[in-house]
Amino acid sequence: MTIINSNLGYPRLGEHREWKHLLEHFWKGQLDNVTFHATAKKLRLANLKKQRDLGVDYIPVADNSDYDHVLDTLVAFNAIPSRFGHFDHQLDLPDYYAIARGTDTAVAAEMTKWFNINYHYIVPEFDDVSFKLLDNRWLRYYQEAKQELGIDGKPVILGPISFLKLGKRHGQYLDDAAVNELLPQLLPLYQQVFEELATAGAKWIQLDEPTLVKTTTVAELAPYQTALEHLHAAVPSLKIELQTYFDSLDQYDKIVTWPIQALGLDLVHDHGENLAHLVDHGFPTDKILAAGIIDGHNVWASDLQAKLALVQQLRQIVTDDQLWLQPANSLLHVPITTKNETKADPVLLGGLAFADQKLAELHTLTVAANQGVAAVQAVFDHNQANLTALNQSSHRNNQSVRAAEAQLSNQKFERQAPFATRIKLQHDRLHLPLLPTTTIGSFPQSAQVRAKRAAWRKGNLTDADYQAFLHAETKRWIKLQEDLGLDVLVHGEFERTDMVEYFGQKLTGFYATQNGWVQSYGSRGVRPPVIFGDVAYTEPITVAESVYAQSLTDQPVKGMLTAPLTIINWSFVRDDIPRAQVQNQIALALRQEVQNLEKAGIKIIQVDEPALREGLPLKQRHWQAYLDEAVYSFKITTTGVQNDTQIHTHMCYSNFADIINTIKALDADVISIETSRSHGEIISAFEQTGYDQEIGLGVYDIHSPRVPSVAEIEANIQRALRVIDARQFWINPDCGLKTRQESETLAALKNMIAARNAIQAQLTTSIH
């Protein structure tokens, strides 16, 4: 009897972002369809071959995508919104991308976070849907791997219940009644996919049902069980690996009895609950336990001794031929390899493991389990030495940080006066009109901006020349903002590659990777910083840029910071101390930056917390602790200023109805929220609960290249004003504008100002 290993999914971007560049060249018309598909195939096959070379026994296929796997699923099953047309065949690339990116006449499909991590998926729309199988992509990619590489892969498909539950009908996520209504129409198509795979020789299929971890009652299990019983009965020769991840299964004892041949459990992010279920209830002798023992969305090297001890514990529950070792979730959410991190501190590098290194760890653990540790003793010894060196390093033992942490309990973090008092002082100081306009922070980073930054980083541009260029670009955009008629300006953030990475480069305890790219949405890659040590403030981060921008105009320019929780939610966070401790270290550092901005004369300071909602634990029983920690760290950051300094915050891509009280507890003077793609859900939430502070609900979607009309923006503003007093309301886009083209940005902002002016003229009330 032998233990084997399995992978759940592999990163798409490419080791040097080849996939990203492929998509963007196609969108710009620089590639034809034939070249696109040939290049995409080359990348797919290279990824499969690499996994085979790294010793993966069961290699996933069809986990690749041309944009997003949920989009792939809705396109395959014809859940295509009617505004994009009607189809009876596999979509060509322009039609496929229109759904994700929008067109001049059709608004892009909504995009939101994939569970509680920084990946975005396209939200299916099930209004008047007529399911049919337009493309069995799972069969195509299974056959490709088999024919080209001789790999008998494991097709990966999003399960029918998760597919439905991740989508919306009439603007609302589907409840169980809606799922039960649509499931009979969808199941025959899944059955067809399964049948065609079985006919082609597939032995296993990985059926991802990630929403299963969010079920808490037996009643919620019914549609999952119905689907699995149907599929197994219809295609008994195709073995089903029911894969879950990101948390534990509350109804494990029921789920494990279903007609599946393998159950994939997350043993990393489960709060220890899945392992407790296994110990308490055991595991059926006729199924495979696919044990997710390697962290698939953090970058730390595993403690191989501890992981092998876990494997030995699992061997007390199942036999070796019942045990697969695998990542806890798809490796889509980590960078590809550490081999390109040539500038990293060797002590840090020894503690890192990206996708390829994680697969190597799996192989090592598989060998150790089957042949004994002696077969890989050198690898184990090297692993322990690396982990010890990192944990004992000065990076993780900063005594000044420890002293500051020790004083936290002795301090009260509240603004000096209540909001009603503060806002009057701020109005007197700022002299803003009714319905003030602003943007969220960043402006388009042109090819020239990126080229100058790259040249500077390579040493081909002096510091002085680079600074002169940044000043020129800032000056140009201050003038553009004034000409547009914006009321509160921003400096544009041309010095920043990323709203989190930039801060990581300025604080201790962070490592900015050279090539640690992960997919955020579509072709957009981000390089999350690695928080590997104690975080401390050493010098001003944003003050010089903000002061320079303010010197160019009499209008207020916002200082722009990223809040602690977003920094850790969008970073790879050290796992040797609690996340809340890291969060508070960052807050203490940023508090000094906020105070330095105020001392430099900046009147408005925006502390962005876009990732607050998305980072919520999947199970509600864990929410309150998370939210309390979020409020606490935000207040550490923002409460050290005077009453007439206005604190803004921004949030995006989230459903806020269930955290309105937390938003209020932040006590920000002004909050801006992304709303355009969520079709008014957030407006409804504020209508139900009320909100006293000032607020900007994004009036147009920046994630699409289309330019909204004045009438469209006016309608969005008018809808918000039915719920929110005009004296509280700000006018702004959804999010930052870094990824947009300059022409799109200027046209959209021009229309936004025109819409504001038209509505402003209709209002007789003034807040000043």
UniProtKB/Swiss-Prot annotation:
Its cofactor is Zn(2+). L-methionine binds at I440, G441, S442, E493, D608. Pathway: Amino-acid biosynthesis; L-methionine biosynthesis via de novo pathway; L-methionine from L-homocysteine (MetE route): step 1/1. Binds 1 zinc ion per subunit. It catalyses: 5-methyltetrahydropteroyltri-L-glutamate + L-homocysteine = tetrahydropteroyltri-L-glutamate + L-methionine. The keyword Transferase applies. Keywords: Amino-acid biosynthesis, Metal-binding, Methionine biosynthesis, Methyltransferase, Repeat, Transferase, Zinc. It comes from the Bacteria. CDD domains: CIMS_C_terminal_like, CIMS_N_terminal_like. L-homocysteine binds at I440, G441, S442, E493, D608. Coiled coil: none annotated. Its EC number is 2.1.1.14. It holds the Pfam family Meth_synt_1. Gene3D superfamilies: 3.20.20.210. It is an enzyme of class 2 (transferase). 5-methyltetrahydropteroyltri-L-glutamate binds at R17, E18, W19, K20, K113, W570, E614. Zn(2+) binds at H650, C652, E674, C735. GO terms for molecular function: 5-methyltetrahydropteroyltriglutamate-homocysteine S-methyltransferase activity; zinc ion binding. GO terms for biological process: methionine biosynthetic process; methylation. The keyword Methyltransferase applies. Catalyzes the transfer of a methyl group from 5-methyltetrahydrofolate to homocysteine resulting in methionine formation. NCBIfam families: met_syn_B12ind (TIGR01371), PRK05222.1 (NF003556). Belongs to the vitamin-B12 independent methionine synthase family. This is 5-methyltetrahydropteroyltriglutamate--homocysteine methyltransferase. It comes from Lactiplantibacillus plantarum (strain ATCC BAA-793 / NCIMB 8826 / WCFS1). The lineage of its organism: Bacteria, Bacillati, Bacillota, Bacilli, Lactobacillales.
